[in-house]
Amino acid sequence: MLKRTYKDTGLEISTLGLGCMRLPKVSTEGEEIDFEKAQEIVDYAYANGINYYDTAYIYHGGQSEEFIGGALKKYPRDTYNLVTKMPIWRVEKKEDVEQIFNEQLKNCQVEYFDFYLCHAINEDNFKQYIEYGAYEFLSKMKEEGKIRYLGFSFHDKPHVMENVCDTYKWDFAQIQLNYLDWEMQDAKRQYEILEERGIPCIVMEPVRGGVLANPCEASNELFKEARPDKSIASWAIRYAASLPNVLTVLSGMSNLDQIKDNVETMTHFEPLTEKD
């Protein structure tokens, strides 16, 4: 598994991260996790060098944190990076930030989070993050060793990102980035803003929720003609991972076939060429 060093810390992060928003479910209706099948995915990920596991308070109706904390419990704590996020829309008063954070530690059965994010920042809710002192509290948790690195995930326009980046000091940021959204959702400019400020980039939605695994018949034919031995999804993963300021690419893998394909892509990683 290809790894990249986080800043100058010496910490090596797998370039493929396991996103825990689309784990196997017991049925197509609802969000209940199929714990047995999901555990198989986590075990395969760990065995193949994935050491970055991204969850959130709200994923799978609140089950995701509890699941991934339990799934990783059998492995040495210093061999993986556990990541979760603060849902500011669940906060009604300052005290709620601390209450939710402590609940997350309990959910995940850990004493600290390796990477922690202010979740889904946009122009409107950034005011709430400021009002409720979320950054200040989370910075205190960082000082106490309960958070190693503090960042944010983002869903808005580039000028909003510039304001967010310049208001506080961030260790990393997570954005939606893929070859469709590079222009359409301003991912290019968002990526540049982070790169200009020396903020490492975590990529979410590299395959755009599966859309880029089967974009259209004409595109599929071009991909298969160029590399008949590679999956169509692998092109999207490689696109994101080829950018120099990307630390890891998150993929929500809901079955073993998907994770095997992505692991193969990142174990024998080939950056995109000009011809590609």
Model-derived features with residue positions:
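Glycine/proline-rich, positively charged
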Residues: 24-27, 89-207, 214-221, 227-228, ...
